[in-house]
């Protein structure tokens, strides 16, 4: 916190964090209801696994480009309007995607036009919704001092994790009424979240008080920050490669129908989210008081890598679910630890910028992970995406061991 942040009085600080937590949770719920249905929906539309990967790549490409822009903009005009705009953009893009998918299911659109419009909707969503994550992280940083930063990032991680717990299961239930129903639900939930943020969140950053804008928005990317950003990008690549192919993997290995797949995948991902949220909400807070982020990062890589290799060998429901639980534990340790390491490496005026850079790193992983994962699944083998992801995590562990990145407290600015 600094003089330029608009910190609520102590009596309202807890409420402000709770409202921000709920905002992130509801937004993530709206996104995660789609996880179980993307595979079955794509196959019903006549699209290949590789084409399905382009939906996430288009979305994340725009997030990669625009996340730093929105992060810096939140420094100049305030966090709240940028966050609300991102949530509205999320809603509009999902509504458009659902309408186009419905037209495709009815045979109204040619396959080429259908694919182009679906990818276009994802491009639009990536541009607008990329404002949400960096702004939410920066708002939480505004509300906490440096000593509590890791715990605060764990709270954000718990909000994401809880969204992942309830979202996939809810998506599986909603898919009983039609494969596009979860997409419409996400669009409506995005509008509700935007309204919640608009009416209840207080501004945490005084507009116009940011540090002078740098000519190069990547000027912060130096020293240990580069290492943390590389880990963010590649661990996300590994994770998203799994997420993008898991519905295909479950359907093909367990020999499920299109109707059965969303329910089974939803249950598995709900377990994944439950474990992740339990670690982020319960274990990260006490661990972060005793261990630095740079000590927790290798632990997360080891656990998540073990889960990926186990998943590549899994062939029945419970071994798949157990492997996903391991991946969830590793991800729950890595995510908030990386966010905390980055946040603690810059001064208070640079929180929005570094959050934007981290969102770009995450988006870079989300941009490449789906294409690699679906490409390996379609062209090499059903197990290849998870072996590849495990190898990436082992390589990152070697990088950490060699580079030994440390959080360096910056000079006040």
What does each of the following model-derived ranges do?
Residues 292-338:
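C-terminal transmembrane helical hairpin of 12-TM major facilitator-type secondary transporters
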Residues 25, 93, 105-131, 233, ...:
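Hydrophobic core of transmembrane alpha-helices in multi-pass small-molecule transporters
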Residues 119-161:
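Cytoplasmic helix-loop-helix junction between adjacent transmembrane helices
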Residues 88-111, 302-315:
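C-terminal ends and interior cores of transmembrane alpha-helices
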Residues 2-14, 202-230, 413:
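Juxtamembrane intracellular "pre-TM" segments in multi-pass secondary transporters
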Residues 54-71, 270-280:
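Central cavity-lining transmembrane alpha-helices of secondary-active solute carriers
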Residues 36-51, 245-264:
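Short amphipathic helix-loop junctions that connect adjacent transmembrane helices
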